[in-house]
């Protein structure tokens, strides 16, 4: 029930004055009563007594004590009621004046639909609102409430969308935590393999050096033993010669021939033979380069990897990111880069210039596509699954195997081309010439050309489609073939 506009709620002035503290002249806050009967705020009387030697009542100066303070619950309740009524009176005054036209002081009973303003009856005749559509406040409020209900419904739907998006980010955060733990393990495994390779190579080189050292030490020991024996023989001969020189002349000369033959047969010392030192160059010469070249022979490299973040729910990418298999649909974390309408995925690299080539092992797969797709500038917002038609008009260039009336055959993504009459390849080679605008496909086993696209490709990524197996056997993988790595050595400069 509305109040009369002439009635203003609120306490009387005399009643309000009775509820004011005699110290701060504000309504009581935590009112207390002294023994003399006067009332004050607890904080006010306490501050007064802080500067007094002996506490007294601030009004009548009667002697008082902090122990005499008694909380006045009745007075506190009256103050609370006073403040509540004052607040209600302020709200009522604001409400009453907000419903009155400031210009004509009339009741706001109309609404101008053009200016979106509340009007009184006098405002309707104002030239500013001449010819405008005006209707009663009640009807306008009914119409606007209906619109607000529609807006409320739209906001609720938007809130649901926000919650759904939040759940997507929660799923992404959980996925990233699991993926990070798995990635950390895989990275450590790969570096452990490299460290193990280097450890084995280091030990092999150290063992070879130790063996050479041992062999040359044995040879040196043998030579030193021989020289020691020869030295002892010579010492014995010197001693014998000294004894003969002390004999009389006849005896000395009688042994001259035999002595000469004996001394002539003594051996001459051999010079130090070459190759006795450890071959330092054999072990330290270009050591890192030689180990690196040996490492290349044991490391498998591919021109690019499969990007698991683009793989549709049907596809499972191997741990080394070089093969993919269609195991049937499984729910994956939602992200805009992922294909959702077909079992497709992309390669990890983006090509926009230069020459590039890669080979794909297809084996006996019965449904596949291999080619490239133009990188969409808005793919971060919409993903790659915006179109169900993966053909040249949508920026897809590929060769695929499909099932026809007369059996399986190969076709291209260009609807205007006829089926390729050559046998279905088991290993496909793709060559991309960005500057020339050529994308060529070859049967890598038969070394024959299949088809060449001519177009302005722009930025493209390798594109793959892998259909499900038609039979009951286990699904076959599609693999990226490893590169043959060779090192060309040239003089610097």
Curated annotation (Swiss-Prot):
What triggers or suppresses the expression of this protein?
A: By TLR7 and TLR9 stimulation.
Where in or outside the cell it occurs: the entry states: Cytoplasm; Nucleus
Which domain of life does this protein belong to? Eukaryota
Q: Where are the zinc fingers (B box-type)?
A: 96-137
Residues modified to N-acetylmethionine: 1
* SUPFAM superfamilies to which the protein is assigned, alphabetical: B-box zinc-binding domain, Concanavalin A-like lectins/glucanases, RING/U-box
User: Which terms in the Gene Ontology molecular function aspect does this entry carry?
Assistant: ubiquitin protein ligase activity; zinc ion binding
Q: Where does Zn(2+) bind?
A: 101, 104, 123, 129
Q: Would you name any one GO CC term?
A: cytoplasm
The EC code for this enzyme is: 2.3.2.27
Give residues where Phosphoserine occurs. 4, 8
- Spell out the InterPro entries in the cross-references: B30.2/SPRY, B30.2/SPRY_sf, Butyrophylin_SPRY, ConA-like_dom_sf, PRY, SPRY_dom, TRIM/RBCC, Znf-RING_euk
Q: What keywords sit in the KW lines?
A: Acetylation, Apoptosis, Coiled coil, Cytoplasm, Metal-binding, Nucleus, Phosphoprotein, Transferase, Ubl conjugation pathway, Zinc, Zinc-finger
Q: Name one GO biological process term.
A: apoptotic process
Which reaction does this chain catalyze? S-ubiquitinyl-[E2 ubiquitin-conjugating enzyme]-L-cysteine + [acceptor protein]-L-lysine = [E2 ubiquitin-conjugating enzyme]-L-cysteine + N(6)-ubiquitinyl-[acceptor protein]-L-lysine
Extract the coiled-coil ranges from the record: 210-251
Every copy of the B30.2/SPRY domain together lies at 284-487
Q: Pfam family of this protein, just one?
A: zf-B_box
Q: In which pathway does it act?
A: Protein modification; protein ubiquitination
Q: Function, please?
A: E3 ubiquitin-protein ligase that participates in multiple biological processes including cell death, glucose metabolism, and in particular, the innate immune response. Mediates 'Lys-63'-linked polyubiquitination of TRAF3 thereby promoting type I interferon production via RIG-I signaling pathway. Can also catalyze 'Lys-48'-linked polyubiquitination and proteasomal degradation of viral proteins such as influenza virus PB2. Acts as a negative feedback regulator of TLR7- and TLR9-triggered signaling.
Q: What does the sequence similarity comment in the record state about its family?
A: Belongs to the TRIM/RBCC family.
UniProt comment concerning the protein's domains: The RING finger domain and the coiled-coil region are required for the apoptosis-inducing activity.
What do we know about how this protein assembles, alone or with others? Interacts with PKM isoform M2, but not isoform M1; this interaction may compete with that between PKM and FGFR1, and hence reduces FGFR1-dependent tyrosine phosphorylation of PKM. Interacts with IRF7; this interaction promotes IRF7 proteasomal degradation. Interacts with TRAF3; this interaction promotes TRAF3 activation.
Name of the protein in question: E3 ubiquitin-protein ligase TRIM35
């Amino acid at each position: 029930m509305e109040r009369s506009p002439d009635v203003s709620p609120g306490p009387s002035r005399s009643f309000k004055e009775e509820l004011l503290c005699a110290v701060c002249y504000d309504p009581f806050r935590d009112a207390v009563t002294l023994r003399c009967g006067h009332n004050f705020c607890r904080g006010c009387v306490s501050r007064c007594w802080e500067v007094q030697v002996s506490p007294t009542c601030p009004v009548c100066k009667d002697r008082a004590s902090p122990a005499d303070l008694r909380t006045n619950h009745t007075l506190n309740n009256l103050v609370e009621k006073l403040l509540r009524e004052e607040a209600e009176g302020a709200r009522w005054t604001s409400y009453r004046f907000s419903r009155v036209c400031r210009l004509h002081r009339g009741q706001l009973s109309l609404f101008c639909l053009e200016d979106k303003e509340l009007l009184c009856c006098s405002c309707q005749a104002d030239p500013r609102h001449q010819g405008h559509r005006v209707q009663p406040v009640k009807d306008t409020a009914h119409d606007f409430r209906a619109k607000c209900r529609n807006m409320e419904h739209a906001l609720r739907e938007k809130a649901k969308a926000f919650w759904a998006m939040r759940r997507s980010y929660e799923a992404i955060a959980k996925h990233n935590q699991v993926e990070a733990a798995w990635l950390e393990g895989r990275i450590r495994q790969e570096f452990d393999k490299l460290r193990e390779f280097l450890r084995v190579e280091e030990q092999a080189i150290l063992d070879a050096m130790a063996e050479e050292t041992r062999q040359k030490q044995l040879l040196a020991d043998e030579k030193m033993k021989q020289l020691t024996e020869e030295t002892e023989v010579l010492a014995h001969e010197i001693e014998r010669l000294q004894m003969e020189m002390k004999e009389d002349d006849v005896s000395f000369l009688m042994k001259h021939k035999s002595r000469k033959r004996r001394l002539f047969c003594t051996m001459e010392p051999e010079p130090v033979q070459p190759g006795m030192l450890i071959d330092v160059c054999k072990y330290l010469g270009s050591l890192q380069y030689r180990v690196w070249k040996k490492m290349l022979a044991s490391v498998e490299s591919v021109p690019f990897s499969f990007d698991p973040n683009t793989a549709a729910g049907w596809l499972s990418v191997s741990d080394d990111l070089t093969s993919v298999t269609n195991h049937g649909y499984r729910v994956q974390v939602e992200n805009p880069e992922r294909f959702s309408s077909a079992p497709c995925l992309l390669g990890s690299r983006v090509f926009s210039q230069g020459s590039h080539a890669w080979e794909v092992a297809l084996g006996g797969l019965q449904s596949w596509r291999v080619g490239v797709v133009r990188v969409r500038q808005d793919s971060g917002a919409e993903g790659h699954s915006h179109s169900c038609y993966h053909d040249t008009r949508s920026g897809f260039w590929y060769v695929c195997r499909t099932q026809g009336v007369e059996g399986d055959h190969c076709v291209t993504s260009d609807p205007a081309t006829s089926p390729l009459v050559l046998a279905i390849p088991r290993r496909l080679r793709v060559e991309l010439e960005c500057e020339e605008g050529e994308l060529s496909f070859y049967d890598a086993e038969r070394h024959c050309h299949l088809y060449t696209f001519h177009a302005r490709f722009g930025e493209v990524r390798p594109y793959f489609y892998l259909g499900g197996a038609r039979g009951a056997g286990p699904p076959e993988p599609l693999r990226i073939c490893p590169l043959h790595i060779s090192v060309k050595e040239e003089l610097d400069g």
